[in-house]
Amino acid sequence: MVPEIKKILYATDFSHNSTYAFSYAIDMAQKRDAQIVILHAIEPIPPQIMARLEMYDNQGVLRRARINGGNEDIELIKNRVKEFCKKREAQIGSPCVERISKIVVSFGHPVDEILKTADEERCDVIILGNHGKGFLSHTFLGSVSGGVLQRTRKPVFMIPLPSEKDAVDLGEM
């Protein structure tokens, strides 16, 4: 028997294709009466680069960002998601904001954070956008997509790049 899909992890880097993949997450959630957990993983900056950046950080922006722990990012993401849902609801009429159960901003390697969040939130499936950049894209998956596929036992939906007419956007981050 195929397990029920009641919770979906939608992992995003806010690239053009990941926002297109969000449409698939919303559609799947609506059809299956499921909830969506949105994850945005921020990869840590290597120490040697961070040291250089801090030399030029006169106003303490980097320090405040570390202390803040992503709270501003979560609010920004929530606002972008609400804007996207309003546009989508105007197009198709069905609501989408109530399908989102949680928004997570985490700091760490994206593959590790996706797998950890999928387990912690008890998600049934994972939805990722597949960038498909370059002439070898038909042979190799992106490092995040490939890493998730290799290390998870959960179903993973890889959403390919949209055509320009199907493109959607959550706005500039």
Give the location of each predicted region:
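Short, surface-exposed alpha-helical segments at coil->helix boundaries
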Residues: 71-87
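Gly/Ser-rich helix-loop-strand patches that form or flank binding pockets
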Residues: 4, 116-168
